Amino acid sequence: MGTIQNLKSVFDYLEARNLGAAIIGLENYLTIHPNQVNSDRLHAIRTDCQLMADYWKRGFKDPQLPSLFQALLQRLYVLWGNICRSYAIGHNSFMSSIYMRQHMSARDWSPQNILEELETFVSNVAILELEPSQQREAKRRELYCQHQHDMNVLFDHILTSADLWTDGIAMAMEEILLSPTVDTNDQQLIVSAVMLSSMELFDIAKFRTLVHVYEKAVDERVRQRALVGWVLALRGRLIATIYPEQIDLVHHLLEDEDHCKELVELQEQIVFCMHAEHDTETIQREIMPDLLKNQSLRMTRNGIEEAEEDPMEDILHPGEQERKLEQMEASFQRMVNMQKQGSDIYFGGFSQMKRFSFFNELSNWFVPFYPNHPDVMEVLEKTGMNRFLNVMMEKGPFCNSDKYSFVFAFQQVISQIPQNMRGMLERGEATLNELPSEELESAAYIRRIYLQDLYRFFRLFPERSAFVNPFDMDGSFLFFADPIFSKTHLELFFNDVTAFFLKQDRLYNVLKLLSNYGEARRDFQFWMMYGYLAQHYANESALAFSDLQCYTNALEIQPDHERALAGLARAFFYREMYKEALETYDKLLTICPDKKSYRLNFAASLTNLGQYDEALKELYRLNYEFPDDKKVNRVLAWALVCEGKYEAADKIYEQLLATDNVYPDDLLNYGYSLWFSGHVDEAADCFHRFLKEEDYDPDFILENEAVLLREKGISEPEQQLMLYLL
């Protein structure tokens, strides 16, 4: 068995609480990959397990047995986790390199020393103000440069530390993350490192730390990073087996309705992040062309220049300038509205600006933007304190990662900008979409820009394959489907989140969400959403309920609900249960007697039941009221075919087929009409075109309307000859 498979099988045994098999699995692994420390730890676990078994088999009833067994299971998981972490680091060149960097630093990684270093930095920054002005800037650069290096290595240490945290380390790190004497930027970066480490390998101590920081943090930026951290670190498979404490931690949070609302917002914001590429395509295809063609700038070999105004333009095209401005403003406003709704409108542009050397450093993808970052200070020294740049970094609608990109790109293009525009920038007169302070400080905004930082990392970092991507389709982004939230207070918000995913047409995700509902929460809206899913989801075998069941259950709760009746009618119709469909559409017509779709489907049900006279009466009325409605004409034509009125049907089909976009079923049904009226060659031509469009086997022509063919007197030899022609 391969190494990965061996470690995977050990986890499967742990999940199944099969302690003995898990011990044997690790013993087999350590036989192939000997390590004295791990072997000693495993031997101690086996010894304790044997003592427990010996005591039990002698007939003693130990009330502490369940807790002792659980403790052994957790000790074995910790050992397994340490081995997995070491294996992952040793078999990935990137992870090995950052592990070696922090390992070779020879620093004291105890939480006490980390706290002391962080507090000393804050003190040194304060002392800077007492330095003579001629020395202050040089010392500032030196101080921040050394501190950023130290934070980079600390980030690497947290990520690649071979051992899972003990409870003591977790409590001490929690103190650091909540301390008012530690810089918030440092706390935010540490939280991101803890999150990234926990996503790679679940660590209950780190998870507990993130939950506690989310509960207790005063700084909203630290708090929101902790929220995202524990959510993305959730591992539902471990809940009931190895660490039931995870349930208690999460359920305690869910007692607060504000926490539940934040989780709803977070789930929706994650999805908006995942639409970044699609939103970029929309902007590039539909919005940017309008903005570019209406602007008065042009690119030259010397950079951007203002285009000269044509004095004849106002004479030849009066009002054209105003029209262009209105069109450009409308395009820009559309982009602003996309951003307000949660779209990541800047991903496309800034995704091309992640090749600066700054982004080679792992922790720089997570560090909050601050002007004293050594790389930023270097740029500001070259460009000067540009007011435009300052305002954009303070109030611009960008995530931290994009702010860094903006600064480095700004340095490269500033010399190519026209002089008059450069003057505007230096005076701070040309800023873009500044955000008010209250929005910048809001929890929702802080969380959104952090998610955008994460999305850029997992999509653009060159070594991203070394990490578990939560934004993948099978990643942890769909946390509302985690079993830990089932049958909790959060279920009160399940319908809102599921409806959101339905609007996004993410049916695969909707199925997972609906599967997480407890039976007590299967209310009217649940059955309506599941019914919609059942009628639109391709993989029927994955569904727990059929659309017929769902709409029937919904109507038991609200008997005369129009949408539920409409869903039930469709379910009957799709199953060719035309009598039941007819009865249901009849009920709908008592509620909405003039609704065209109900009248049309009522007539279609009559047609399929062979009640052609009644069907045609309604269809003629609909055709009179809606003469250009193709759906009405389509059903009318087919009813005429069934009634034997082929000439009238053919006229309608000729109209339907005289368009650029031919509906394949019109070819098929016109073919039947021609065949029944004796125009075999023309019928075969229609069938040929239909089969080519749909890529069906010729047998479909006979199987699709086998009953009608017999009713129309088409003999078996005639049917076989048609197949011969096809």
Residue ranges and their predicted role:
Residues 35-36, 219-223, 490, 523-524, ...:
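Residue-level recognition of tetratricopeptide repeat
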Residues 22, 510, 544-547, 581, ...:
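Single-residue signature of alpha-solenoid repeat helices
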Residues 229, 529, 567, 601, ...:
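Canonical tetratricopeptide repeat
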Residues 16, 504, 537-541, 575, ...:
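Structural motif corresponding to the intra-repeat A-B loop/turn of tetratricopeptide repeats
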Residues 364-570:
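Alpha-solenoid helical-repeat scaffolds
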Residues 526, 564, 598, 632, ...:
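TPR alpha-solenoid repeat register
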